[in-house]
C-alpha cells in the first residue's frame, strides 16, 4: 500500500462479548468471529482479538515523552508517538536528511493509523496542534504581504502612462504548512510549490482524503507516491502559458480511520 499502515489496534470488530484482558486500547468487549471454512467443522467460532506489538517502553526525549505520557494505554501511546514523529518531521523537513539507496531521505512520513471507532485514535487531533504555531505564523506573514501588495497594486493601476517604466507589483505566494485533505491534485501541487515543497496533510477521518481522491478533480494518489520518495512535481497550464515545478518535495501525511475506511482510498499493491 502507499501508506505505511500502522495497525495499533485490532483490525475489525464483529460482535460484543466480555473480554477479560483488554489493556491495549481495544474496546473491552471486542471479539472476532471466525467464519466457517471447508477445513473446519462448519461452525463459526468466536476468537479473541490478536495482540499486536507496541513500541518498547523507552525513555524518549523530554518534549516527546511529555506527549506520549498523555496516552492511557500502550496503543494510545503508540498513536501519540507516531503522530508526533510525523508532525515534527514536517516541521524539520529539509533541515534533516540522510542518504539511503544513493538518495537523500528526509523525516517526512506517511502514516495511516487504523482502529475501531471510539478506541483513542482521535488523540491525533491534539498532535496536529504541534504544527499550528508555524502554520499560523506563515498565514500571518502572508496576510501582511498581501495587504501591502494590494496597496502597491492600487497605486500602480493609477500610474497611467508611467506603467511602462514601473514594474508591476508581484503577488506574494500563499505559504502554509497544513494542507487540507479535501483538496484537488492541482490545489495540493500549488500549496506545495508555494511553500517550497513543504506540507502536512493531517486528517482524523480518512474519508476526507478518499472522497477527495475519488472526486472529479481529485486523483492525486500518484502525487502522494511521488512525495513519498521526495520526487519533483511539475505542471503546465496552457491558458496562460504558466509552467511551475518543485525539484524536491517534503510532504508528510497523517491519517486515521476505521478498517472500513481503508478500502475506499483505492490504493493497493498495484501502486506500490
Task: Tell me what each language-model feature is.
Residues 1-2:
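Short, small-residue-biased leader/transition segments that mark boundaries at the very start
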Amino acid at each position: 500500500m502507499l501508506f505505511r499502515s500502522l495497525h495499533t489496534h485490532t483490525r475489525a470488530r464483529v460482535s460484543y462479548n466480555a473480554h477479560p484482558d483488554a489493556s491495549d486500547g481495544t474496546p473491552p468487549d471486542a471479539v472476532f468471529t471466525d467464519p466457517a471454512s471447508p477445513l473446519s467443522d462448519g461452525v463459526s467460532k468466536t476468537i479473541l482479538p490478536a495482540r499486536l506489538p507496541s513500541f518498547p517502553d523507552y525513555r524518549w526525549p523530554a518534549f516527546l515523552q511529555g506527549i506520549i505520557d498523555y496516552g492511557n494505554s500502550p496503543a494510545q501511546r503508540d498513536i501519540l508517538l507516531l503522530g508526533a514523529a510525523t508532525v515534527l518531521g514536517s516541521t524539520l523537513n529539509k533541515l534533516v536528511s540522510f542518504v539511503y539507496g544513493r538518495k537523500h531521505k528526509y523525516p517526512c512520513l506517511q502514516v495511516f493509523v487504523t482502529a475501531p471507532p471510539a478506541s483513542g485514535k482521535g488523540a491525533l487531533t491534539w498532535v496536529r496542534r504541534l504544527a499550528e504555531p508555524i502554520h499560523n505564523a506563515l498565514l500571518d506573514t502572508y496576510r501582511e504581504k498581501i495587504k501591502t501588495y494590494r496597496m502597491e497594486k492600487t497605486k500602480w493601476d493609477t500610474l497611467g502612462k508611467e506603467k511602462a517604466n514601473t514594474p508591476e507589483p508581484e503577488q506574494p505566494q500563499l505559504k502554509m504548512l497544513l494542507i487540507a485533505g479535501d483538496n484537488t491534485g492541482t490545489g495540493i501541487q500549488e500549496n506545495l510549490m508555494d511553500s517550497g515543497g513543504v506540507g502536512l496533510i493531517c486528517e482524523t477521518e480518512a474519508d476526507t482524503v478518499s472522497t477527495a481522491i475519488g472526486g472529479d478533480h481529485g486523483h492525486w494518489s500518484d502525487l502522494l507516491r511521488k512525495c513519498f520518495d521526495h520526487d519533483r512535481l511539475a505542471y503546465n497550464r496552457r491558458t496562460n502559458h504558466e509552467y511551475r515545478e518543485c525539484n524536491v518535495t517534503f510532504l508528510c501525511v497523517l491519517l486515521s480511520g476505521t478498517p472500513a475506511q481503508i478500502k475506499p482510498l483505492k490504493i493497493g499493491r498495484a501502486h506500490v
